[in-house]
Amino acid sequence: MKLSIDNKKHVIFSLSKSKTLVENICKKLNISEGKMVCEHFADGETYIRFDESVRNKDIYIFQSTCPNVNDSLMELLIAIDALKRGSAKSITAILPYYGYARQDRKTKGREPITSKLIADMLTKAGANRVVLTDIHSDQTQGFFDIPVDSLRTYHIFLFRVIELLGKKDLVVVSPDYGGVKRARLIANTLELPLAIIDKRRPSHNVAESINVLGEVKNKNCLIVDDMIDTGGTVIAAAKLLQKEQAKKVCVMATHGLFNNDAEQKFMEAFDQKLIDFLFVSNSIPQYKFKAVKQFEVVDLASLYEEVVLCYANSLSVSAIYERHIEWIKKHV
């Protein structure tokens, strides 16, 4: 039975960082996006107004809290407050990218746990449910006192990766110990070997790869990470894999931030044949690497379409993965 959504009861809104993504989602759902105004005053203050009634409606509001992280976050908090004051029946905040996710614990004295603070702010603003995507650490889900769905996207990437590299001689690589769980999930799904990069981080945004744990010689390597910030981690990993005589190196990361000189570093990595393919999703709007054949953006609209349909029809979100993983295991 084909699922549908009643646009009179369920409305999707997008804020500034998720507009194109939501346009694609609404096209797939064959519904109209909700009408709203989001503006910024000369002093930087954010102004939000919803131009249609939200009373007694189930609302899904999309916003990636990506650079400028603080402005994006304030847009979302103010929008949620406006929806609550407009008597929305429920407010589901869908954050394709969750800023401050890396500040999820104290590593030194007198540090904040900012990820927990953001969770409290979203809850206090009036969100009834939060949807996160490939969150940096699973413990973030426990920071919320409201229901949280943590989505995974690897099954969407895998179709394209296998098409390019095939399964033969393919090894899944975690660029550090923190990503082992994520990489092992993919390796187990495809029944592939796993390798781990032994990495140390002497300072913020600086990574040094020391050693490879696992066999990568004459193998096609798939480096898997949740995000690319400055690119230091994956480029250092790619250099080490090349040194260990890997055949091809493909990088797959859900969130492409590409801060500082990341674009230049990756262009050099492409030219030097360090990295053969780089995949990110459109969880964050992508404006770099235009017309670069080694770079590809994977669309998450189909995933969010399925998620919204599950909410609208009171179905299990977990079933989405079970269905996709079963298909991958049978056909890949």
Curated annotation (Swiss-Prot):
Cofactor note: Binds 2 Mg(2+) ions per subunit.
InterPro entries in the record: PRib_PP_synth_CS, Pribosyltran_N, PRibTrfase_dom, PRTase-like, Rib-P_diPkinase, Rib-P_diPkinase_bac
Subcellular location: Cytoplasm
Swiss-Prot/TrEMBL cofactor(s): Mg(2+)
Source organism, top-level taxon: Bacteria
SUPFAM superfamilies: PRTase-like (SSF53271)
Result of knocking out the encoding gene: Probably essential, it was not disrupted in a global transposon mutagenesis study.
Annotated catalysed reactions: D-ribose 5-phosphate + ATP = 5-phospho-alpha-D-ribose 1-diphosphate + AMP + H(+)
EC numbers: 2.7.6.1
Residues annotated for D-ribose 5-phosphate binding in this entry: 201, 225, 229-233
Keywords recorded for this protein, A-Z: ATP-binding, Cytoplasm, Kinase, Magnesium, Metal-binding, Nucleotide biosynthesis, Nucleotide-binding, Transferase
Broad class of where this protein is predominantly found: cytoplasm
Quaternary data: Homohexamer.
PANTHER family recorded: RIBOSE-PHOSPHATE DIPHOSPHOKINASE FAMILY MEMBER, RIBOSE-PHOSPHATE PYROPHOSPHOKINASE 1, CHLOROPLASTIC
Protein name, per record: Ribose-phosphate pyrophosphokinase
Organism: Mycoplasma genitalium (strain ATCC 33530 / DSM 19775 / NCTC 10195 / G37) (Mycoplasmoides genitalium)
Lineage: Bacteria, Bacillati, Mycoplasmatota, Mycoplasmoidales, Mycoplasmoidaceae
